[in-house]
Amino acid sequence: MHQGFFLLFATVSVVTALTLVLARNPVHSALALMACFLQISAIFVMLGAPLLAVIQIFVYVGAIMVLFLFVIMMVDVREAVLQRFMPGGNLPALALLLLLGTEMVVLVLWSDRFIESPPVAERGGDAIRDLSKTLFSDYLLPFEIASVILLAALVGAIVLARKEPG
Amino acid sequence: MVPLWWSILLGVALFVIGAGGVLLRRNILIVLMSLELLLNSVNINFIAFGQYYDDFRGQIFAIFVIAITAAEVAVALGILVALVRNKSTLKVDDVTIMKG
């Protein structure tokens, strides 16, 4: 049951990711990416991280995809629709990718470390409380730095996208 | 329970697809979306290993990755809007003015 759902979500996420890369129209790519993020958040639930799944939906599907669609709406994508998918001269990149992918798959399947199924973690219902206690005590400084980075990115995005005066 | 290597293989598949999008596509918007996909595949690995070792640090790293990704997308799309206003192109190959 569990594994069947995992296989279903994984298959759909891989298919939508392929759609994202192969689609000619950027709007179709954005919608495929949204579907892929939903599948990935379902996988987060199955991996025992419901908080991350909610954050994934809020941040990616709610904020980042809306940002992407706004930018697609602002710029003219008609020229981009007409261009070919794969201009020539990309064979080295493709070969490198295939090599990298096969290497990762072979290394994962080679080692018997990952084959055994995980120890059943019997944690109480307070996993999110423990997570936030760890986040706000041990990782407080990185958390604050991340908030400062977000503020800097906010200001930077406004400055970059503003019309030059005069 | 789902075995760990299933999650890792899913991460590998999404990573390779996203890297293919970054390397093979010439549209800046699709390159940025493929970058999102790459970061998400890394998140899957973080969370899978965090569950496997029963450790919170996987989820905490994933939260930081999501925060930094949001910042990156905001800045990248700001740059994209400024670029389109000045140069009116969406192809990566046309943006080579910093090449000496």
From Swiss-Prot, chain B:
Subunit structure: NDH-1 is composed of 14 different subunits. Subunits NuoA, H, J, K, L, M, N constitute the membrane sector of the complex.
Transmembrane residue ranges: 4-24, 28-48, 60-80
GO cellular component terms, A-Z: NADH dehydrogenase complex; plasma membrane
Membrane topology value: Multi-pass membrane protein
Disulfide bonds: none
Assigned protein family: Belongs to the complex I subunit 4L family.
Highest taxon in the source lineage: Bacteria
Keywords: Cell inner membrane, Cell membrane, Membrane, NAD, Plasmid, Quinone, Translocase, Transmembrane, Transmembrane helix, Transport, Ubiquinone
InterPro entries tied to this protein: NADH_UbQ_OxRdtase_chain4L/K (IPR001133), NUOK/Mnh_C1-like (IPR039428)
Gene3D superfamilies: 1.10.287.3510
Subcellular compartments: Cell inner membrane
EC number, as in UniProt: 7.1.1.-
Organism per entry: Rhizobium meliloti (strain 1021) (Ensifer meliloti)
Keyword Protein biosynthesis: no
Pfam families per UniProt: Oxidored_q2
Gene: nuoK2
Molecular functions (GO terms): NADH:ubiquinone reductase (non-electrogenic) activity; quinone binding
PANTHER family, per database record: NADH-UBIQUINONE OXIDOREDUCTASE CHAIN 4L (PTHR11434:SF16), NADH-UBIQUINONE OXIDOREDUCTASE SUBUNIT ND4L (PTHR11434)
Any single GO BP term: ATP synthesis coupled electron transport
Name of the protein: NADH-quinone oxidoreductase subunit K 2
Tagged with keyword Cell membrane: yes
Function noted in UniProt: NDH-1 shuttles electrons from NADH, via FMN and iron-sulfur (Fe-S) centers, to quinones in the respiratory chain. The immediate electron acceptor for the enzyme in this species is believed to be ubiquinone. Couples the redox reaction to proton translocation (for every two electrons transferred, four hydrogen ions are translocated across the cytoplasmic membrane), and thus conserves the redox energy in a proton gradient.
Annotated catalysed reactions: a quinone + NADH + 5 H(+)(in) = a quinol + NAD(+) + 4 H(+)(out)
